[in-house]
Swiss-Prot record:
It catalyses: pyridoxamine 5'-phosphate + O2 + H2O = pyridoxal 5'-phosphate + H2O2 + NH4(+); pyridoxine 5'-phosphate + O2 = pyridoxal 5'-phosphate + H2O2. Disulfide bonds: none annotated. Belongs to the pyridoxamine 5'-phosphate oxidase family. Its cofactor is FMN. GO terms for biological process: pyridoxal phosphate biosynthetic process; pyridoxine biosynthetic process. HAMAP family: PdxH. Catalyzes the oxidation of either pyridoxine 5'-phosphate (PNP) or pyridoxamine 5'-phosphate (PMP) into pyridoxal 5'-phosphate (PLP). Binds 1 FMN per subunit. This is Putative pyridoxamine 5'-phosphate oxidase. Pyridoxal 5'-phosphate binds at L16, N17, S18, H19, K77, Y134, R138, S142, R205, L206, H207. The keyword Cytoplasm does not apply.
Length: 226
């Protein structure tokens, strides 16, 4: 495979942070990483078209007992002062890896504001009643899509999935959306952080990296060289 004609080596974007040009310890609005995440998330939300931009999309990295890491994008569905929640299939590759090893990492990247946030911690399953409540709040088309797919399992072709979708759609028409119940293998996870890294890009590549690391019951703050 040949390198594309695009000059990849010389792609260098200009980073513009007009409101907060530098991430300085003396000017942090809070010493809580959860509060700083909230501030940054609200900031990018205020500058985004949420109809087309999924600012809650996050790269989730997991490692099973075979020590082979894997990453994929998932959608963050809630964040609280204790951590970050998402929903998926428990028998998917990520679900199996989390069962074997609950340590995981998240990476949020928002190029519009030249910022990214890394979060590392331990993942726990959310209570099933929370998963049921969220499942029932979803559009019926989303429920049908999720229930049509035994995530990460090999299927013969797309028609196999489409036939399951058609059957479930017909069921929902006959009996209502409540007939599309949550599968036992589907539920939520909550990542409880022990490490945050807030990164703000700079055009001269002297980027800002501020870390919060959990030490018993306090967060230690430090700056890393870019």
């Amino acid at each position: 495979m040949e390198t594309p004609s695009i000059d990849i080596q010389n792609i260098r974007a200009k980073y513009l942070n007009s409101h907060d040009p530098y991430l300085l310890e003396s000017k942090l609005p809070t010493t809580s990483p959860f509060e700083l995440f909230d501030i940054w998330f609200r900031n990018v939300a205020s500058q985004s078209d949420l109809t087309f931009e999924e600012i809650n999309a996050v790269s989730l990295s997991t490692v099973g007992k075979d020590l082979r890491p894997s990453s994929r994008m998932v959608l963050l569905k809630a964040y609280t002062p204790t951590g970050f929640s998402f929903y998926t299939n428990y028998t998917s590759r990520k679900g199996n890896q989390l069962e074997e090893n609950p340590n995981a990492a998240m990476l949020f990247y928002w190029p519009k504001v030249n910022r990214q946030i890394r979060v590392e911690g331990v993942v726990e399953k959310l209570p099933d009643e929370m998963a049921v409540a969220y499942w029932n709040s979803r559009p019926v088309a989303s429920r049908i899509g999720s229930k049509s797919s035994d995530q990460s399992k090999v299927v013969p072709d797309r028609e196999f999935l489409e036939s399951k979708k058609v059957a479930l759609t017909e069921l929902s028409v006959r009996e209502g959306a409540q007939a599309i119940t949550k599968p036992e293998s589907w539920g939520g996870y909550h990542l409880i952080p022990r490490y945050f890294e807030f990164w703000q890009g700079q055009s001269d590549r002297l980027h800002d990296r501020i870390v919060f690391e959990r030490d018993v019951d306090v967060w230690l703050l430090k700056r890393l060289s870019p």
